[in-house]
Amino acid sequence: MSAIALTVSMLALVAVLGLWIGNWKIYGVGLGIGGVLFGGIIVGHFAQTYQIVLNGDMLHFIQEFGLILFVYTIGIQVGPGFFSSLRVSGLRLNCFAILMVVVGGLVTAIIHKLFAVPLPIILGVFSGAVTNTPALGAAQQILTDLGSPPQLVSQMGMGYAMAYPFGICGILLVMWLIRLFFKINIDREAKAFDSSYGQNRELLQTMNVAVRNPNLHGLSVQDVPLLNSDEVVCSRLKRGDLLMVPMPATVIEIGDYLHLVGQRDALEKVRLVVGEEVDVTLSTAGTALQTARVVVTNEAVLGKKIRDLNLKQKYDVVITRLNRAGIELVASNSANLQFGDILNLVGRPEAIEAVSAIVGNAQQKLQQVQMLPVFIGVGLGVLLGSIPLFVPGFPAALRLGLAGGPLVVALILGRIGSIGKLYWFMPPSANLALRELGIVLFLSVVGLKSGGDFINTLVNGDGLAWIGYGAMITGIPLLTVGILARMLVKMNYLTLCGMLAGSMTDPPALAFANGLHPTSGAAALSYATVYPLAMFLRIMSPQILAVLFWTL
């Protein structure tokens, strides 16, 4: 068997064994995708024992390409919500996530200096303790750039493997300890969250308003500023028994009923000016109008503003809501259309058909992957990651690397959505498949490279000490941030658990947090809020630590 065929066969064996190990669960907790690392260690141990030689260049390429695939698909997935998560609504949660990363870095620095742990080992332990595989890849690359010997860089995988199991279990232990220490009642926390979130959430609502203001009589809809703002959409007008879609030139009369869509505070502003809220149905049932949901798939309209389509004037159709990546937005005239946007339409059946053809509404396109944008994004990411940043006093130029470069590019492209006919939308199933493939390839190679000396290090070397260091890097930041969040800002416990899981970019911990109260969405919401920024910081932090430790 050729070296290439043997290498591919061994990687397949590692993946099968590792995924099988990852599916093992003890009290509902398993290693998940991390099992691939241990599958690689087992196979790597026997490969060295029986002197099986694999193609080193091929292993190196597969490891790096797997990492690129993983971080790029992560960036495309979280890109649309990354920048919005930094706004005021998630500012507090993201501040705690930043604090956790900083405390983890400080603990790592103290252990490195206090116990004289070699730099490659402590960075590997750090990556495993926070269960973040891209951090390991980023740390390996920056150490290689700094000139660290390859045999030392390869030891990082062992440090990662030693710390990883407690990284998975430690966060669950901390959640339990916080619950015990503060004597938390889960049902009470869930009710408190539902009450608070129900009052503050920025979901779109509807309101039927009767025109009572005599100053509006005889004015057209376009002459009333509040009815043309980006915060409220007037989707229907009822006059007597006639229900219509209001055009910009439609004249308002006293006694008209308007159906408005927007956030509650914006609707209240319109009500104060227009008249009073009334309990009158403006349903399209039994009328010439109907409602429909269509998907934007036509490349010709991507990036265009809703006003540019002139749907009201041409087709007497109004867009009442815009759903983007599961988030409902006001369909303001200035909103740009992106691939995969779901539009709620109101109009006559034949007009809705015409509008559907304009925006695309081709469901099958949502299941197709445009490969050209994928490789453009990957190429740009690698180029960005290769750009050297020279800092006076540093022994080597800083780079975003193969982990940071593709991530930053993917975040930006995911936020932009499309450029001309190129769109970076990726079906969730395709994104997940590429992401899982990438991480399996990366972990398989890391495990194979680490397996030869793993058992000896654990039994006869410093393996147990590394496990202890990892436990400190896992536990101290989690306990510090968890206690501060609960004591200082009285953070809801379910929200706190989701924030801790998101800060560790740990899906098994999210599953555990969701299981605390299955009907509450508190944990999932806070996890999604902090995950994008936390993932970015987790990838960048070992590179910063590596450069700082190297120079000190």
UniProtKB/Swiss-Prot annotation:
Keywords: Cell membrane, Membrane, Repeat, Transmembrane, Transmembrane helix, Transport. Coiled coil: none annotated. GO terms for biological process: potassium ion transport. GO terms for molecular function: monoatomic cation transmembrane transporter activity. PROSITE patterns: RCK_C. One of its GO terms (cellular component) is plasma membrane. It comes from the Bacteria. Residues 192-276, 279-361 form the RCK C-terminal domain. The chain crosses the membrane at residues 1-21, 26-46, 65-85, 96-116, 119-139, 158-178, 371-391, 393-413, 439-459, 464-484, 493-513, 530-550. It is found in: Cell membrane. PANTHER family: K(+)_H(+) ANTIPORTER SUBUNIT KHTT, TRANSPORT PROTEIN YIDE-RELATED. HAMAP family: YidE. This is Putative transport protein YpsIP31758_4141.
